[in-house]
Amino acid sequence: MALFNSAHGGNIREAATVLGISPDQLLDFSANINPLGMPVSVKRALIDNLDCIERYPDADYFHLHQALARHHQVPASWILAGNGETESIFTVASGLKPRRAMIVTPGFAEYGRALAQSGCEIRRWSLREADGWQLTDAILEALTPDLDCLFLCTPNNPTGLLPERPLLQAIADRCKSLNINLILDEAFIDFIPHETGFIPALKDNPHIWVLRSLTKFYAIPGLRLGYLVNSDDAAMARMRRQQMPWSVNALAALAGEVALQDSAWQQATWHWLREEGARFYQALCQLPLLTVYPGRANYLLLRCEREDIDLQRRLLTQRILIRSCANYPGLDSRYYRVAIRSAAQNERLLAALRNVLTGIAPAD
């Protein structure tokens, strides 16, 4: 039975209510947010420009779209900012109006919700535990002319796995040849050093739509900022016309403009994840009764080999919240997702897991 009503991580209010404590007393490993926090440059810009909330945002978000265009070296007409990447998912689903779409499971729940709202028939391609939850070329044969679009998350959520580039290119080529729109969710790709994703390939393939998020990497989930990128100017113009006006608030737009210029923050994040991510992964692998999947992003998928242990409930008693993956199609109650946080926070989780899985209290 599900412990929480929410279909997503980061629901610290509900978890704190279960415990009868304040939300700030919980250590949250359920939301995949950069533990370095918001860049200082962004925080300073927001404080210095608070009076911008007394005016309507620029309806065209000219400066934000220009900043995103410079960042990716593409025309601004290819980009449409949204109130978090989730809004962009719903925008592209309602704008394309597919009759039949394929989604890969386990995966982010909002693809299915957005497609269902558009009255679309949904087909599911199931990743296999036997393949380590990695996408394989078997999906190519499932891409048939009667499909209108395919949603892929790269790296995938909740597995953190990124398919090999040749396979992704083969999928993109097949989608183009069959007139299938390929929607690539690259929400977590910024955490992978020097991984450009598929935005550079858009000029040669207007069938590719890329979803991006600034929420996770720059730690601004409360502001909400994502965007959609596609090289078909006419199609993007249609998306723009159907989007709700003033979808992005003024502070979120400003945060995006400033964050994209902070290359030092990008380097600091990559350094943290390279060092702490590797250490945390190895430490988790040393724990008994736990299988850890080698994700590329800022979170890891775990499988507990003791079905009688509800890790989420047990850790919650120690005021630590992790994400149960039982509600992901294809996964079950043995699976959990944990964010990679600071070394001290990760040590606290490791000690709690060790205590639960072995019954041996960690040494002082």
Swiss-Prot record:
Sites where the protein binds O-phospho-L-threonine: 8-9, 32, 157, 323, 337
Keywords annotated in UniProt: Cobalamin biosynthesis, Lyase, Pyridoxal phosphate
Catalytic activity from the UniProt record: O-phospho-L-threonine + H(+) = (R)-1-aminopropan-2-yl phosphate + CO2
EC number: 4.1.1.81
Family matches, as PROSITE patterns: AA_TRANSFER_CLASS_1
Cofactor(s) annotated in UniProt: pyridoxal 5'-phosphate
Protein family membership: Belongs to the class-II pyridoxal-phosphate-dependent aminotransferase family.
Function: Decarboxylates L-threonine-O-3-phosphate to yield (R)-1-amino-2-propanol O-2-phosphate, the precursor for the linkage between the nucleotide loop and the corrin ring in cobalamin.
Protein name: Threonine-phosphate decarboxylase
Organism: Salmonella typhimurium (strain LT2 / SGSC1412 / ATCC 700720)
